[in-house]
């Protein structure tokens, strides 16, 4: 029987008590300055073409240079990518990713950002669901993608970028990877990005509106198969505008890209926000605590939005010193549960407070943030740190299982606002289940106090958040159960001092079968991204189930774990 949910706003929403928490510079209502992130980039290009748009390690790239790279990609793809088509981007944090975004959007295409850690086994679903016409790949990611593309069997225009592209000669020794000096022929079926520099740049550009889909960002589905949230250009611009205003970003700021560009945080809180605020973005190939500390110190980075594990890694680095991060003052964290002990530790070391934030892939990044300059309260009932208050134009309510609007009791958090995705790509069932009358059912359990502060106390969904990456248990279970020795498997998240949570698998073997933890982890590594591979595997006789046969994950989570 379907649940009936009232559309009447809860009391806290009616009074908008959280607006009273806003910084004086944040209005109660916001309108994006641009209709698309592409328009924001074009404005930066028109105003300051020879100003530095980004720093890749120590190597600068101006708006004009980034525009040239994007136009060459656009010209190469023009014959294969029509308006409404999809372009896959599977790469680490390099300027080529930004060039691919611009090129795809100028062609009127949607971008499919894919984690650089995906295996060919995982990629087959993404390709069959998104059906891209073209792809920009990092050199290290090309083998897995090309193998999956061959199995998929559709024609693709593939361009491969090297990690050393755009680096000054003096900068190359600092790179963290070995796959930077590839030369000679490109991987089979692909072309080097560097070879496109001989092409005549394209100049045409599609007309984009705020309701057009900008991104297909994949997140976990209830069946274990990832689903793609349809984030529109309007969604992206609104969220970027919020970050610009909430973080008080001005022309003197320099934004550090600490999140991957395959993740909604990297795409919105870093790339789009830098363009809307017209400020330079500092990036490295991938996150490394020592490299981040060097970049902050060298470039005078002032702000970032990062998983709490990024701050922990920098604190724990042997070269960490407060003077190195003295300019780093506008800090936010989200994507994984934030511990007050880590916030306190960073503040004790630097004098700077880390502000909490909360959002989903489906909400195009943050919907709740702690107002800049304020401290998040701790929920006396659960002990969790508040995720903040809803950002402008965002409605939030807490409902019971029967749809009853709750006061300060714990219930499911639902949201409505201009940053909410328009649904899931080619997935009517999950769209209908999660998006209802303009409200997004988050599956997260939380409460709101009388002052408008929100607290997340649990997840109604069983998603595991490891170092900011979401891991859906059923996907891991399906991978494990494909092993001939395994009868069934169940995966839960267990506490991890560094990652926040880490996957643990409970495995039931077929009678007479044998397997070891090492063997099964190796099996998973061939099929899953590294962060999804269960760190712990426990062999059990059976899995706990109720009378209807439903798996009781709570009992597994509550078991003692060492």
Per-region residue spans from a language model:
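Conserved AMP-binding/adenylation subdomain of ANL enzymes
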Residues: 237-254, 262-303, 317
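Structural core segment of the AMP-binding/adenylate-forming
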Residues: 2-7, 76-80, 106-195, 511
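Conserved AMP-binding/adenylate-forming
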Residues: 59-60, 74-121, 130-133, 470, ...
